[in-house]
Amino acid sequence: MSRAVRPYLVLATQRSGSTLLVESLRATGCAGEPQEFFQYLPSTGMAPQPREWFAGVDDDTILQLLDPLDPGTPDTATPVAWREHVRTSGRTPNGVWGGKLMWNQTALLQQRAAQLPDRSGDGLRAAIRDVIGNEPVFVHVHRPDVVSQAVSFWRAVQTQVWRGHPDPKRDSQAVYHAGAIAHIIRNLRDQENGWRAWFAEEGIDPIDIAYPVLWRNLTAIVASVLDAIGQDPKLAPAPMLERQANQRSDEWVDRYRAEAPRLGLPT
């Protein structure tokens, strides 16, 4: 007897390892086309830009390292057209839908869902259900080492490369900045706390995956997600993506850990 096919939504924070998971699921050809559908701002049609991540920061030594804002092109799609795009773009021919949602994107998702007809309720859980079509399997990816996560984020903000390896020249121009890393740590901790509070409030018990476990057991974890969404676990591929961190990232992590206590910065 065939099992029920279910959609899934990966819940995470930036640089937590979620891309490693969703790209491995995508590679199966049977687990949807998981994308970060809910990151695009209607005002620009773009994901948040470096300066938007540092909104409210007035430290010029940070701001001078960030690219200027791009005005983009406003997204004028109707709410129903937007929902249809999300549904069709995330689905493989077998009917499985996959996607990824960061905590900082939840307010925008709720705002866009509020304009849809025939709502099933209020709040984030109803918004997810009304956009996707039904309740997904929730998969929570998190990274216990938030300092390494923040360093990875800070490098990506400067190079503007969020997956794969950046251009060596631009990567060499990325600059260590303890204050910027601290700002990102606070942001990431707030986001992760948001997810955990929401799980408790809604009584949700997601598939919980820590990055170190994911990295060491990728094929087995992908198999477990496939099983949860009604697909053959044997389709889980061998590891694909390479680790983006390198010796320079490790040096920045060590330097920040050494400096943070003296500077009163979070770790």
UniProtKB/Swiss-Prot annotation:
- The UniProt record lists the EC number as 2.8.2.37
GO-annotated cellular components: peptidoglycan-based cell wall; plasma membrane
Gene disruption: observed consequences:
Loss of T2S and SL-1 formation. Unsulfated acylated precursors of SL-1 are not detected, which indicates that Stf0 acts before lipid addition to trehalose.
Q: Where is the active site?
A: E36 (proton acceptor)
**Protein family per UniProt:** Belongs to the Stf0 sulfotransferase family.
Cited NCBIfam families: TrhSuTaseStf0 (NF047724)
Could you tell me the Gene Ontology terms of the biological process aspect for this record?
Answer: 3'-phosphoadenosine 5'-phosphosulfate metabolic process; sulfolipid biosynthetic process; trehalose metabolic process
Subunit record text: Homodimer.
Any idea what job this protein has? Catalyzes the sulfuryl group transfer from 3'-phosphoadenosine-5'-phosphosulfate (PAPS) to trehalose, leading to trehalose-2-sulfate (T2S). The sulfation of trehalose is the first step in the biosynthesis of sulfolipid-1 (SL-1), a major cell wall glycolipid and the most abundant sulfated metabolite found in Mycobacterium tuberculosis, that is a potential virulence factor thought to mediate host-pathogen interactions.
Q: What is this protein called?
A: Trehalose 2-sulfotransferase
What is catalysed by this protein?
A: alpha,alpha-trehalose + 3'-phosphoadenylyl sulfate = 2-O-sulfo-alpha,alpha-trehalose + adenosine 3',5'-bisphosphate + H(+)
In this chain, alpha,alpha-trehalose is annotated as bound at Q14, E33, P34, Q35, E36, F37, F38, Q39, P48, W53
Q: Which InterPro entries match?
A: P-loop_NTPase (IPR027417), Stf0 (IPR015124), Sulfotransferase_Stf0_dom (IPR024628)
Q: What is the lineage of its organism?
A: Bacteria, Bacillati, Actinomycetota, Actinomycetes, Mycobacteriales
Q: In which pathway does it act?
A: Glycolipid metabolism
Q: Which GO terms describe its molecular function?
A: 3'-phosphoadenosine 5'-phosphosulfate binding; protein homodimerization activity; sulfotransferase activity
Q: Which organism is it from?
A: Mycobacterium tuberculosis (strain ATCC 25618 / H37Rv)
Q: Which UniProt keywords apply?
A: Carbohydrate metabolism, Transferase
